[in-house]
Amino acid sequence: MKPVKQDAVKLLDIFDPEMASLLHREEKRQFETIGLIASENVASPLSTCLEGSVFTNKNTEGYPGKRFVGGCELADQAELLALERVKKVFGAEHANIQSGNATIANCAVLTGLLERGDTFLGLTLDNGGHLSHGAKFHYSGREFNALHYGVNRETERIDMDQVRQMALEHHPKLIVTGASSYPRMIDYAGFRSICDEVGAYFWVDCCLLYTSP
C-alpha cells in the first residue's frame, strides 16, 4: 500500500496551502507541548491511518449483517474484529463501537437505562466530572434528575461516604463514575458495593481516564 497519508499531505500543500499551514502548525504545537487534557491523548498513527482510509467512504448504516446498503462485507468484518477485541480487552459479553464520540455514547446509555425524570448520581462538574453526567445546561441534566457527589477537600478523592449517603437518601436508578479532570484512581469496588446496596445500575464512564486493562 502506498503511503497515502504522506501523499495526501503533499497534495494539500499544493492545492490548499492555507489549510496545509494550519495542519503543520497544529502538528508542531502538539509535539512540542505536554498536554494534560484527558480527552486529548495522542492517537496512535495506526488509528489515524484507519480513520483516514477508504473505509471513510463507505456508508455502513446499521449493524454487521443488517446494513441498509450493499457492499459492506469488508466493513462488517472490520467492525466485528474491533468488537471482539474490545470484548476481550474488557472481559465483556457485549460491546458497541459505533458512537461518533463519548458524549453521544453517554447520552445513549442514559436514554437506554433511564426514563425521563429518573434520578441518577454523578461527579459534580466543578470537582472534575463530565458535563454529560448531569450538567444543568446539558441534555443529561435537563431530561433526568441528576444529583452530584463531590471530592473530599482533605483527601482530594471522591467522597465515598457522601456517595453512599446520597444513594441511601435518593435511591437513584443509576450511579455513574468517571471524570474529565479527576486524576485519581477511582474506587470501582466501592461504587459497585453502593450500587448493589440500593439496587442501582453501575455505569463506569472510562473514556477519558482508565487504568490499562
Per-segment meaning from a language model:
Residues K2-K66:
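N-terminal "arm"/small-domain region of PLP-dependent enzymes with the aminotransferase-like
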Residues V176-G199:
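Active-site core of PLP-dependent enzymes with the aminotransferase class I/II
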Residues Y210-P213:
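Conserved small/polar residues in nucleotide/adenosyl-binding loops
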